[in-house]
Design a protein with these regions (language model features):
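Adenine nucleotide-associated cytosolic modules
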Residues: 1-169
Length: 169
């Protein structure tokens, strides 16, 4: 909710898309932003509808896992905005794209890493946690150059992991 609140406060054109094929379970009530009334519902839908109603800012959702590079690249393609800077002057501005990799498997992290490497401009924030520890890594690409390495550049062993997408389990 904090990122959504920030986007709302900045009053900038933004697209907010949540993708998740998981349903809310009792164990999610402890560490995630869900309430008992959400049990059994799609996580992406619950959060998108909640944030849209609270902040009055549109939120989109995909109620399934993103498991192909093509689908991920389509979702993170930046929009172009035309901004008037004077009576006869218009400027085209590219949307800033943030990819939040809140995934629980390394095959999905590898997919996000590949999308990061193919993007011109992208901020990719990956988070992961265990019972008593966790990490957040922020990778940044600007004009086709990596400014800050993504999680796969810092911990390359995750790119070699042999786990599966959630739908393959």
């Amino acid at each position: 909710p904090h990122l959504y609140r920030l986007l709302h406060a900045l009053n900038r054109p933004a697209r907010f898309i949540l993708c998740d094929g998981d349903l809310v379970e009792a164990k999610n009530l402890i560490r995630q932003n869900f309430a008992p009334a959400d049990l059994g519902q799609n996580k992406a839908r619950v959060l998108a509808e909640r944030y849209a109603s609270v902040f009055g800012m549109k939120a989109e959702y995909v109620p399934s896992f993103v498991e192909t590079r093509e689908e991920l690249m389509r979702l993170i393609r930046p929009g172009i905005w035309e901004i008037k800077e004077g009576p006869y002057l218009y400027k085209l501005k590219r949307e800033m794209v943030l990819l939040l990799g809140c995934v629980d498997n390394n095959k999905s992290r590898r997919l996000c890493h590949e999308a990061f490497c193919q993007s011109q401009d992208l901020v990719y924030i990956d988070s992961g946690n265990e019972e008593f520890s966790g990490q957040v890594v922020c990778g940044v690409r600007r004009n086709g150059r990596t400014i800050f390495k993504p999680v796969g550049g810092i911990a390359p062993e995750i790119l070699k992991a042999q786990d599966r997408f959630p739908s393959e389990i």
